Amino acid sequence: MARISAHVIDAIADRVDLVSLVGNYTHLERRGDDWWGRCPFHHERTPSFHVVPDKKMYYCFGCGVGGSTIKFFMEIEKIDFHEAAVRLAKRAGIEMSFEDGVHAPSAHASFTMQLCEVYQRIAETFHHVLMHTAQGARARAYLASRKVTDDSIRTFKLGYAPPDPVWLFQFLRHKGYSPEFLARSGLFAKKSERIAVFSDRIMYPIADRYGQVIAFGARALGTAPAKYLNTADMPQYKKGEHLFAFHCALSQMRKTRAAIICEGYMDVIAFHQAQLTYAVAPLGALLTKSQARLMRSFVDRIYMCFDADGAGRAATYKAILLCRSLGFEVRIVELNGGTDPAECACIEGEDALRKSVERSTTDAQYLIRCARHEHSHLGADDTSRAVSFLFPYLSVLDSAIQREQVMQDIAMAFGIRIQAVHADYLRYVSRTTQKGTTGNCVLSVQGTAIQVKEPATGVRTAQLRLVLAVVANPELFELLRESVCADDFEDPMAKELFIILEECYRADTRASPHVLSCCTTDELRKLVSEAIVCGEFSCNAPQIVRDGVALVRRNRLLKERESLVGRLRRFGDASSGEECGSMQELMMEKQRVDEELERLKGVRK
């Protein structure tokens, strides 16, 4: 693959605002010249993720991840360097160029970008059909009957797929898309590649956090066998990693530090029309860990509003455990008569939705009520079974005080002593611990979610510290290179880093992003990121480098002296004139080394 030219990497670093980019994934707050937030790569309560705009670098003191603008985008989007650079350059309006003048993107990257393009195009086309054509009249009437406003149709880019199942194939062929590409696009039936998956349906575009359409949900208007259809997982879309309307809700999520999670597209729209514009929906039956973590950096409180039927209660229970394990506060929104939010808004008005959120209950109150409902169908001897329903919830609470309070509420609700609840809970914990597993899939999430890794920066030798000081202060590299060379370094990472700095110096690309892009291991990248961001070498760097250079030179001279002494010993008592001459040369060389070592002592003092 062609190597991206250095000036493009420089342009990305200069023109892509790292604070804004990171801000799409976690909430940042300014402290002095830098920005801090919760790390988007691991679960944490106290912000330890540090962004330094003037150095165009980030670093997490909790898990040790760090790097440049391109590195962040690579890691957060799970793509390679080439694709990350191309996508960032496109977003910033930077013309791509390559060292050999040839751009050869990977087949996967090219296919993914083409998929995003075609999904965005047809979302706009479906929206036009809905809003401005006679074919869309029936769909407009349906949405009006559900009290969906024109403003909401525009906000969510709702559309209508015409009833002719061949129309979309012909439309896209006319736009220049090949039959081979369309067959792989996820838009057409596998057994009949001209037949559209979506026809005669209300279309709900699913977008990523930037508003780029990547998939569709669809509701049939006619008598189709499947009332609802959704895009299958594709290279650009994994349903368990996205939330419907996340890009629309993100701004208000940041302001309120809250999110409403409901079940369906129409439920989300109903909440937004009620000015509760921080509502989103999972794209499946259950909220996933990836979806919950998507909100974690922006949200402290989750309002859950799932259906009141058995499946809805089960989904609520699992979502509570998951969100609690990730540190969210959770409240439950319950609607009158067991209606869903869209029905509630239609029947009782938008104010009813707002009031339902205001009177939401805690997750503990909700679960205790569910347990008591279960107890009402059991015999008196089965109270323990109903109470044990709550033990997984107790396990995901990270506060002992909170856990004790919930135990008191359980005891009061069931008319039993708190000591009995506590004893049964301890037995439950003991059993799950002995098995080496929690016995509950969501409890196992807890162990992963709250684990915070120590930075894997390893032990830093004096040589490595010297080179890291130069990495953090690249203007000092000339001072380093005029005194030492790569072979003077015994530490392998220090040697590798010196070689990288030398290559960047010769290419006149000593900026941090270039140094990072040349690092061959994650450990070295973490060391470099930490050195640049942490500020350890921001004070007295020239003296650190001078002392380090003196130490490297001293080690080199000591090795040279040891070699000379060994050679002198081998001469023994020189007899011939030639041997005497050679021995004299070695002694003079040793004297020179000794004098140099004495001078270095003076420098170090």
Curated annotation (Swiss-Prot):
Q: Tell me if DNA repair is a UniProt keyword of this record.
A: no
- What GO biological process terms are annotated to this protein in UniProt? DNA replication, synthesis of primer
What cofactor(s) does the depicted protein rely on?
Answer: Zn(2+); Mg(2+)
Q: Which GO terms describe its cellular component?
A: cytoplasm; DNA-directed RNA polymerase complex; primosome complex
Q: Where are the zinc fingers (CHC2-type)?
A: 39-63
Under which main EC class is this enzyme filed? transferase
What does it catalyze? ssDNA + n NTP = ssDNA/pppN(pN)n-1 hybrid + (n-1) diphosphate
What EC number(s) has UniProt assigned to this enzyme?
2.7.7.101
| SMART domains to which the protein is assigned, alphabetical | TOPRIM (SM00493), ZnF_CHCC (SM00400)
- Which terms does the record give in the GO molecular function aspect? DNA binding; DNA-directed RNA polymerase activity; zinc ion binding
Q: Indicate yes or no for the key word Translocase.
A: no
Q: Where does Mg(2+) 1 bind?
A: E263, D307
| SUPFAM superfamilies to which the protein is assigned, alphabetical | DNA primase core, Zinc beta-ribbon
Ranges of residues in domain Toprim: 257-338
User: What binding details are noted for the cofactor?
Assistant: Binds 1 zinc ion per monomer.
Which keywords, in A-to-Z order, does the entry hold? Answer: DNA replication, DNA-binding, DNA-directed RNA polymerase, Magnesium, Metal-binding, Nucleotidyltransferase, Primosome, Transcription, Transferase, Zinc, Zinc-finger
- Annotated residues for binding of Mg(2+) 2: D307, D309
Per UniProt, subunit arrangement is: Monomer. Interacts with DnaB.
Family, per the entry? Belongs to the DnaG primase family.
**NCBIfam families hit by this protein:** dnaG
Domain notes for this protein = Contains an N-terminal zinc-binding domain, a central core domain that contains the primase activity, and a C-terminal DnaB-binding domain.
Question: What's its job?
Answer: RNA polymerase that catalyzes the synthesis of short RNA molecules used as primers for DNA polymerase during DNA replication.
Q: What is the designated name of this protein? A: DNA primase
Taxonomic source organism: Treponema pallidum (strain Nichols)
